[in-house]
Design a protein with these regions (language model features):
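Conserved polymerase palm-domain catalytic core
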Residues: 3-4, 9, 53-54, 66-223
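Active/ligand-binding-proximal structured segments within catalytic/core domains
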Residues: 34-43, 143-144
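Active-site beta-loop-alpha junctions of metal-dependent nucleic acid enzymes
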Residues: 60-64
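Generic short alpha-helical segment signal, independent of protein family or function
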Residues: 2-5, 20, 43-48, 76
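Charged boundary/loop elements
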Residues: 41, 45-57
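Detector for glycine-centered tight turns/loop "hinges" at secondary-structure junctions
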Residues: 19-20, 124
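Conserved phosphate-binding loops in nucleotide/dinucleotide-binding enzymes
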Residues: 24-27
Length: 223
């Protein structure tokens, strides 16, 4: 039970990324971290039942090595797809739609809203949070995963394999995702550019997210 529980504003800190830019983190209080951990114990098993099969980040018994192995499995054969869409989501954690989370995450909505709207303190000033789930929150990785889950099924449903003996055809669509980084394979550059990418953009827009035009690219595996 909530029993009048109200989370405190997050403490904003910045860490430097490899490219020299700063990544903002929102650090909850110890009490808020404990409450998030408690609710995560109930939410995590639910998240596992709806997770994409080839999602590897922030999941028990999965690692970057597993994601790399799956990429190898998808691309190593002579009959494997030759083209890859490398997806980069702009500030994924910072821009997830609060409305989407409140409509789709199966947990106490009042408490989830309080966590999302708790704001953060920086330089002794309180700032509101209108979107996103803070990097630094214990429950945030699972919320981000649940936001992005469903893309693999959408791609499979949109680009089915024709298994007819006379007209066998496969678009060679495979998704491998680690947290907010992902690749999608395809039989041609045109398929990825004209059909797959617009579908991904639409999927992300519904969740308040966008692809980075600068960092998202389509490449041949030999490049």
């Amino acid at each position: 039970k909530r029993r009048g529980y109200t989370p405190q504003p997050l403490r904003r800190v910045h860490i430097r990324k490899r490219n020299g830019k700063l990544r903002p983190l929102g650090i909850p209080t110890m009490k808020d971290r404990a409450m998030q951990a408690l609710y995560l114990m109930a939410l995590a098993p639910v998240a596992e039942t709806t997770a994409d099969a080839n999602s590897y980040g922030f999941r028990k018994e999965r690692s970057t090595a597993d994601a790399v192995q799956q990429c190898f499995n998808d691309l190593a054969r002579t009959t494997s797809p030759q083209w890859i869409l490398e997806g980069d989501i702009k500030g994924c954690f910072d821009h997830i739609s609060h409305e989407w989370l409140l409509d789709n995450i199966p947990m106490d909505k009042v408490l989830l809203r309080k966590w999302l709207k708790s704001g953060f303190i920086f330089n002794k000033q309180l700032f509101p949070t209108e979107e996103g789930t803070p990097q630094g929150g214990i429950i945030s990785p699972t919320l981000a995963n649940m936001t992005l889950d469903g893309l693999e099924k959408l791609l499979a449903d949109s680009f089915p394999i024709n298994r007819s003996k006379k007209n066998y055809y496969t678009p060679m669509i495979n998704l491998v995702r680690y947290a907010d980084d992902f690749i999608i394979t395809g039989e041609s550059k045109e398929l990825l550019e004209n059909h797959v990418k617009p579908l991904v953009i639409e999927f992300l827009q519904a969740r308040g997210l966008t692809l980075s035009e600068e960092k998202t690219k389509i490449t041949h595996i030999e490049e």
